[in-house]
Design a protein with these regions (language model features):
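Conserved acidic residues
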Residues: 352
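A conserved beta-strand element that flanks and buttresses the S-adenosyl-L-methionine
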Residues: 355
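Class I (Rossmann-like) S-adenosyl-L-methionine-dependent methyltransferase catalytic domain
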Residues: 4-111, 136-144, 212, 233-246, ...
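Class I SAM-dependent methyltransferase Rossmann-like catalytic core
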Residues: 125-183, 196, 210-263
């Protein structure tokens, strides 16, 4: 079977997360085999993450988190039965997954937060709180992405290993607070964004001040040994880093191919990241491409969170890429779920790459298909769409909403569901190539128009 570049790849079976989750490994391989028998192009990513050099670390972390999840489930069960409802309702809640559950959700979640931090990072461990307070925010991915390069500190503040970055925010520092969005101070834009979403001004100011205070604490917080072990070796962290590597590899290969085939300068090409967050992954791609070729495309970074975009601007300046990015702070979806019209962002321009690899797992099927069609409209003939989703048959899948307590809810999908949604959006099966990360956590879909 060939990929878009005409290269043969072996239709091998996977040893996902080194096979430590036997049930997930079996289900993923069965799913992949079925899809291949139907003529779908599905490949398995390589184990290139540094964590794979420490297989015992991956196995030990998996077992450590499995024990923690079991303990948290028991704590949750006891709390529900003692505090929240009649026996009949309690039995229903007890069987409900770790997600928001109406009026009970906040009460349960608030209670569990105290135990999550201890079970994740050690009985007396509180130094991870600044990171955990960012859950649901794109800033958490700065820590995960740069896990191997973070300095690690002991209980008494001594350096156990010196890394490229001194704190858990990785490359992000306090210069982010000085950034402006469309010429306006960051704080002002953040407050206005909340007001636009129906929050009164006084509450908006209070919430923004609290968030900025939490981010400042995050930027200053050191990384402890237990915290470092988890973010280096857990399945979710591996999956995120592998997703980035896969997306960036596809992007660089495509841009180089277009430059050679169509005799175009990479400098003149256009890439869009829809729901870009801090833009770290895309900026890494730009930096690598510029280092290799001396050229880089213009990248449109589109997100609705002003703070994440301020982080993207700050990082772009550090890497001398500010002239290669366009920042657009826009609400990505209407209240009814309709995707933002890209006409206002792109005008008459066409994209060489449309990427939204960290977004689809938060979207209902209908919105997923609408976003696909909207992006395709602005993609050049021969352009590349890159998207993805967390796998429903992934290893240790209960961890994300359980012990981790991640919000909002992630819609894990089978690989087959990903193919079907893309096909229902008007994309032929032959135009889709899927890469399942070596951890088994994510599938990245590449679609050539």
């Amino acid at each position: 079977m060939e990929n878009f570049r005409g290269e043969q790849y072996i239709a091998e079976a996977g040893d996902f997360l080194n096979g430590v989750d036997h049930e997930a490994n079996k289900k993923l391989n069965e799913e992949i085999a079925d899809l291949r028998s139907e003529g779908c192009r599905v490949k398995i990513g390589e184990k290139t993450d540094p964590a794979y050099n420490n297989p015992d670390g991956i196995k030990d972390t998996y077992n450590y988190l499995k024990r923690g999840d079991a303990k948290l489930k028991e704590i949750r069960k006891n709390f529900i039965h003692k505090n929240l409802a009649t026996a009949a309702i309690a039995n229903v809640l007890d069987k409900t997954p770790f997600v928001k559950m109406g009026k009970w959700g906040k009460k349960i979640d608030l209670y569990l937060e105290f135990f999550r931090d201890k079970l994740l990072y050690g009985e007396n461990q509180t130094a991870s709180k600044p990171w955990h307070n960012q859950r649901g925010s794109a800033l958490t991915f700065l820590t995960i992405s740069e896990a191997e390069g973070l300095s690690v500190f002991g209980k008494n503040g001594e350096i156990l290993s010196k890394g490229k970055y001194p704190t858990m925010s990785g490359p992000l520092d306090e210069s982010v607070f000085d950034e402006k969005i469309n010429g306006l101070p960051l704080t002002e834009v953040m407050v206005q964004e909340k007001i636009n979403n129906g929050v009164d001004k006084a509450t908006a100011i209070e919430e923004v001040e609290k968030r900025l205070s939490d981010v400042r604490e995050f930027i200053q917080a050191p990384v402890t040994e237990k915290f470092s072990n988890v973010i280096r070796h857990c399945a979710d962290s591996l999956g995120i880093r592998e997703r980035v590597e896969t997306v960036n590899g596809l992007s660089i290969d495509h841009l180089k191919k277009v430059a050679e085939k169509d005799n175009r300068s990479i400098d003149d090409m256009l890439v869009m990241s829809f729901g870009c967050g801090t833009g770290l992954a895309t900026l890494k791609m730009l930096k690598k491409l510029k280092d290799e070729t001396g050229e880089a495309p213009t990248v449109i970074l589109l997100d609705q969170d002003p703070l994440s975009l301020a982080a993207a601007q700050s990082l772009a300046k550090k890497w001398n890429l500010e002239d290669k990015i366009e920042i657009h702070c826009e609400r990505l979806f209407s209240k009814l779920g309709k995707p933002l019209s890209l006409k206002g962002v792109l005008g008459d321009r066409k994209l060489d790459i449309a990427e939204d690899s960290g977004l689809r797992e938060y979207l209902p099927d209908g919105v997923y298909k609408q976003l696909t069609r909207e992006s395709l409209k602005f993609l050049r003939t021969g352009g590349l769409m890159i998207t993805g989703n967390m796998n429903v048959n992934r290893p240790q899948k209960e961890f994300l909403h359980g012990l981790m307590g991640w919000v909002p809810k992630v819609r894990m999908r089978s690989i087959k569901e990903g193919f079907k949604l893309l096909q229902k959006s008007g994309i032929p099966k032959e135009s889709i190539e899927a890469t399942v990360t070596a951890s088994g956590v994510y599938t990245v879909f590449a679609i050539e128009k």
